[in-house]
């Protein structure tokens, strides 16, 4: 019986570049991305001992993985900036909009940086 493959080798290589590009995210948050072989790449989130990760999302498309990890990275950064303040009540969008324009630009430029590292062309 032939096993079904859910991700091409080309896309698997691209997903690995994306996962590697966001290495700093894994240090900031309880998130990791693993290569699950023929199934694609799996984002594991919110580790809670003794049961493990609460959320697992499988990706077979490098652009979708990139966008997911970008959102996680940005939201984590915004949370860390607003932690301990009333800004968090505004949600991530509100926190972002309350930042000075230069800080907003700095965060947005990081998306371009991640895309270059991951070789994702948007």
Segments (PLM) and residue ranges:
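Acidic, low-complexity, intrinsically disordered interaction modules
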Residues: 35-114
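Broad, structure-driven detector of short, well-ordered beta-strand segments within folded domains
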Residues: 30-34
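Short intrinsically disordered terminal tails
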Residues: 1-4, 118-122
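Negatively charged, low-complexity tracts enriched in Asp/Glu with abundant Ser/Thr
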Residues: 2-29
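Generic secondary-structure transition motif, activating predominantly at the C-termini of alpha-helices
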Residues: 23-26, 73, 121-122
